[in-house]
Amino acid sequence: MPLSPYLSFAGNCSDAIAYYQRTLGAELLYKISFGEMPKSAQDSAENCPSGMQFPDTAIAHANVRIAGSDIMMSDAMPSGKASYSGFTLVLDSQQVEEGKRWFDNLAANGKIEMAWQETFWAHGFGKVTDKFGVPWMINVVKQQPTQ
């Protein structure tokens, strides 16, 4: 079974989906808003397990595919700023041009942690935190020697 990360956004999941579609070519596989959920499945003020209320337009669950890998996401906080730590999403490419394009797209309005460059292990590598605060490594691995 594959391992899929789940990103929690602070009321801007729809914006993040559109951003990843534009910058990384993400394919939207599934999306449901809180307003589209059956009323029986929605939190009510008196029995809300999360203790939070979401607008109907907030995303309850979404799944996108980026470079063959699924990333799930939702609006887990009604507003504020999401904080991401302790992990980094890694995008591997076989083509330097593709990796550089991904890096440049994520770096626009983001923060470069390590500039795009060739390393001893990669034809191209860079670390960036995107405009939503999600950390990424973009990697174009060199051919591994056979043993």
Curated annotation (Swiss-Prot):
Disruption phenotype: No effect on phosphonate metabolism in B strains. Gene3D superfamilies: 2,3-Dihydroxybiphenyl 1,2-Dioxygenase, domain 1. CDD domains: PhnB_like. Transmembrane segments: none annotated. InterPro entries: Glyas_Bleomycin-R_OHBP_Dase (IPR029068), Glyas_Fos-R_dOase_dom (IPR004360), PhnB-like (IPR028973). It comes from the Bacteria. This is Protein YjdN.
